[in-house]
Amino acid sequence: MNDALALLLSMLVSAIAFAVLFPPTAPWLKKRLFADLRHQAVAACHARLAGLRTRFESGARDLMYQAHTLSADHPTCSATPCWMFAVLETGNAAIDLRHELATLPSDPRYAPTTPWRRAIETMRAALSSLFARPDAERFDATLAAVNDAIDATRQTLDAFTPTREERHRLQRILSHLHFVRTALLDPESPLAALNRNRPVRPQPGASS
């Protein structure tokens, strides 16, 4: 009985000490959760494709729930759904893009060494780097890489006449690239603050 009571008291003391030293609303914990949430987009770009979408979406939603719970009474809580949407939109587009590339037929024009495929790989690496460590330089590099990949893919579509099925696949690839670009340029995205070329909204009361 005494041993059980001592164990219970020690657990209670440990719980109180942990809550005091490492409160669940600590800024470092929120920062860690947001970093883990962004890492889901990194995984979408590079992780093993088999079962990736299920792992990606469940992991992102679990982290979003944790971050939202911790931020419920914090003024930065509005960042939680913004990052959630940015990660889900960009990550799903990256997964869709990778699936389309993985199912391309064995043809020299679709080889990973072709310029348009290399442009897409460059974009994927830049996108991963941006979500791993967001900053203005990485944003600029990612946007430029997406534009290059779009141009290269469009040139490939115009360079020859693929079969109907292959053309549709290339068009879907192009659509996924455009979706990534749109997500990057979304003015409501948390990445919008990194866009140094975004239009400046006029302030209320400013003279015209």
From Swiss-Prot:
Signal peptide per UniProt: none
Organism of provenance: Burkholderia cepacia
Principal place of residence: membrane
InterPro entries: PHBA_efflux_AaeB/fusaric-R
Recorded GO CC terms: plasma membrane
UniProt-recorded Gene Ontology molecular function terms: transmembrane transporter activity
Protein name: Fusaric acid resistance protein FusD
Subcellular location: Cell membrane
Regions that span the bilayer: 7-29
Membrane topology: Single-pass membrane protein
Keywords of the record: Cell membrane, Membrane, Transmembrane, Transmembrane helix
Keyword Zinc-finger: no
Functional note: Involved in the resistance (detoxification) of the fungal toxin fusaric acid.
